[in-house]
C-alpha cells in the first residue's frame, strides 16, 4: 500500500457525476476539521498485514504540536478525524513515455475491499473516519497544516 498522509486544519470531498459534469447528489459531502487526509493506493499484493501495520502506525503517529511546539501528539491526543480517499494513481509508473502506466495498481475489486478494510481498521483504533467514493471522480479540498505531508510505502518498508 502507498499512503500520502497530509495533516490538515480542515478538508472535504465531493463526487462529480461524470455524465452531467455536476455534483453527484447521491453522495453527501464528507468534511473533517483537524486531522489527516489519507490518499490511499492499493496493489494486488496488499492485505491484512499491510492494513494492520498502517492503521496502527497512522493512529499513533505523533505529528501534532504540544504546548512547546514540538511534534509530540497523535491524532487521538488532539481529537482529530480522518478523510480517506482511494487513489490508484499513487501506483503510477512514469519510467517510460509520457503517459503513466497503472499496471501495478490493484485490481478494482481487490483494491476497494482492502481500502474499506483499512478504513475499518482505523475505526477499530478509535478514530473517526470519513470516506470518499471508491472509483469516483472526486473533488478533494484541504488546508494542509504545517505543511506536514508523509509518504508510507509498505513495499519499500518491507511490510
Swiss-Prot record:
Its EC number is 3.1.1.96. An aminoacyl-tRNA editing enzyme that deacylates mischarged D-aminoacyl-tRNAs. Also deacylates mischarged glycyl-tRNA(Ala), protecting cells against glycine mischarging by AlaRS. Acts via tRNA-based rather than protein-based catalysis; rejects L-amino acids rather than detecting D-amino acids in the active site. By recycling D-aminoacyl-tRNA to D-amino acids and free tRNA molecules, this enzyme counteracts the toxicity associated with the formation of D-aminoacyl-tRNA entities in vivo and helps enforce protein L-homochirality. This is D-aminoacyl-tRNA deacylase. A Gly-cisPro motif from one monomer fits into the active site of the other monomer to allow specific chiral rejection of L-amino acids. One of its GO terms (biological process) is D-amino acid catabolic process. It is an enzyme of class 3 (hydrolase). Belongs to the DTD family. GO terms for cellular component: cytoplasm. Homodimer. It catalyses: glycyl-tRNA(Ala) + H2O = tRNA(Ala) + glycine + H(+); a D-aminoacyl-tRNA + H2O = a tRNA + a D-alpha-amino acid + H(+). NCBIfam families: D-aminoacyl-tRNA deacylase. GO terms for molecular function: D-tyrosyl-tRNA(Tyr) deacylase activity; Gly-tRNA(Ala) deacylase activity; Ser(Gly)-tRNA(Ala) hydrolase activity; tRNA binding.
